[in-house]
Amino acid sequence: MSSLQATNTGSAHATSAWMRWLTHRWSVQALALLGVLMVLPVINSGLTLDDFLHWSTLHEGARVANHTGSPWGLFHFLAGNVADNQALKATGEMVWWAANDLRTLFWRPLTEWTHWLDHGLWPQSPALMHLHSLLWYGALILLLARLYQRLDTGSQVRARLAVLIFICSSLHLSAVAWIAARNQLVAACCAVLCIGAFHVWRTRPSPRHGWLAVAMFGLALMSAEAGLATLGYLVAHALVFGAPHQPHQASSVWRERVAPLLPFLLIMVIWRVAYNALGYGSSGSGFYIDPASDPVRFAGNIMLRLPTLLLAQVFGVPSATLNLLAPAQQALYATAAAVALALCWWVARIYGVWASPVARFLGIGGVLALVPMCASETTDRLLLNAEIGFSWLLAMLFARALGQHRPRRSWDTLPAKILIGLIVFVHLVVMPIQTVAYAALRKPLLTPTSVLDPLELPDGRQDPDARLVLLNPPLAALTFYYPSVRRYHGMVNPASMHALANSFHDLSLTVVDAHTLELRSAGNKSFIDAFSRDVVTRPFKIGEAIQAGPIQAVVATLSPHGTPRSVRFRFSSPITSSPWRFYVWTDAGYVPYTLPAPGQTTSLPAPDLSRALMRQLKGEERRQAQSSE
């Protein structure tokens, strides 16, 4: 009995120490500093993917696509013009299976100015560009702390615990660590300012804050499409709070709840009309779906993706898991996620969380913020705006459990506390470790495939007419970035670099004749990615011939999901002639490959990614040791 009392006393002292620290006058600033320090190693991770396109646009004057309505067109990747896309296929920058009308154009003018500042003041310093993003992240943490304190005037500890949960989260790390993803941080800062100003405007007569909320919403939309998630919180606020500064007036539902939203709805409509009129948006890709042009399919995706994103938010299960599953398995996964979330709702209910209007507001707002995110394939990066609400919700749940708040029924206590303990362990133990580890390992994890692989291919100075054929790159769509990466590092590109398949699965290669080879994926699996072509609206057909400059791809067989399983590639000149150089990707990167004789078949086994990763990590350790000597 004394041992149990001692344990309880020790636990109470530890909890009390945490409470005192969270109520310290400098705890908010300390939390912001801690959040930045946890991810500080990313400043050494250099440029990645879109970062190289931004460099090319701002320093070489390159234009990936028309940039009407945008200062530089930094987020204009593919304009959907068939002739332009065919030209990109001819050089290999677009994979052969990409939709001819593939379009990915995003309108983010406010964020573009931040990148222009980077390349104007410190163009040769990716570290300072990362530091710039970290300043936005620190500002977001401080703004969140202020918002929570404004909403939750009854508990300083709970508000700051919410900030602690937010900075420990690994869900938004890619938005912080990737320079090109800064748009999400800028939009989130504007969103938090908008929500806070809207709350002040609706809880006490303050027209100035109303105008501020409207302005911040507009800036959020000009920062990133993710700014649209802000409207979810405003709708939730109107539903939960109405017009609390007029509690004794007989106001209609229209006046209390709907009318305050009209300025924001008007801005959203104007933004969307301008967005469409200027040609922005995405089409032809399986990664993005336009809700306006295909609302039925978007609704179906909400059923699958919303539970998946919420499961990632609460339990930390990677949301990209859904993308790895077959359609039938996706439905089962989403159902299981919904059941797990229902259990969480039940636990929050028995602990009285939903009795708080702030909890209902932030909970509904967090869910609504994820609805527009369901237009894209699931990735944890989409959860940043939802974390605004869920960080506080989790803080309240943890505080209730720590504070010995008694559930409504005693028999609920044990299973509820087990579930809460699991969530606490995920958010305050696992996620901080993931955050620090990924920040430290981001460079060795991403640099090999995004930077080193394209640099391993021969310099065009040696043979400017060479046409490189990459039989099985790890991610074929990354060849879109290869020319910019190589130019950034002072290399000259060859005439073309064509990727034929992804190395997701084992492949077999057959040389059919002097001009033709065939690639076949093992089993019923496909070797293409979903990003470059939406097979629902642009299905493949057996016998379909696709021209990619000097190479013609003919679909021979399809997988059960309608994607190519075997393809014949016919080359404009004999495959043994001088322009063609064949490469395979192995655990050690790209290596030259000698084709078998006509009529023979050979295998291209899928690389062991775990072995490749360990080799990359060891190689990075050696490079760091050499640089320090």
Stretches with model-predicted labels:
Residues S2-R486, I551:
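Polytopic membrane enzymes that build or remodel cell-surface glycoconjugates and lipids
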Residues F52-L58, P71, F77-L78, A98, ...:
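Intrinsically disordered, polar/acidic, low-complexity terminal segments
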